[in-house]
């Protein structure tokens, strides 16, 4: 076990330094050499031993954030004091207000030039978040009468794809005004399923994140 500790520490150091630089300079404006310069004498070979490219480093940073998000989703999913609809509203509010969201929009990765990152987001949405966290809540909502749908699996995917992809200013390069319009359409769609779960506070936060991205890109 001791022999594996140092490589793990090195990888964690690389990720921590890279994330800080992504925050300070933005992903697109941070080079591998910038990361090396902040690693206290580690060589380029040390980085490439753990990560094949800057894109791989970004994916690893994103994986860290996904793990934290999954913990939050599981905690809300497993609560016994909320209806299905209340859980969905709690998830949306908690997700958009997480401090790490501002970090992500500050890093501002270019999804158009990083198709692997976009695929990773889509894959996690469809294969992980929708079936493991949102679908159980949909089924609970149907059972307790707070959600109206005959297609819980598809609705779980649709809701997350709209929230994580279609409304994501980093993917569609949306301005604050465009984000507002998408938010309103998303709210109308949700209300059609009896899900009046969006509010003005969430809208203002989305506009704030869009503004952070537009300033950083």
Whereabouts are the PLM-identified features?
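Generic hydrophobic, amphipathic alpha-helix propensity
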Residues: 10-18, 35, 61-65, 69
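Helix-turn-helix
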Residues: 21-56, 60
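A short secondary-structure junction motif
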Residues: 42, 68, 98-106, 141, ...
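Hydrophobic/aromatic residues within well-ordered alpha-helical segments
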Residues: 54, 61, 65, 69, ...
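Hydrophobic alpha-helical connector segments
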Residues: 60, 74-105, 156-159
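Hydrophobic alpha-helical bundle segments that form small-molecule/ligand-binding pockets
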Residues: 73, 129-159, 163, 170-174
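Short secondary-structure transition hinges
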Residues: 100-146
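C-terminal peripheral helix-coil segments that are non-catalytic and often amphipathic
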Residues: 139, 143-144, 172-217
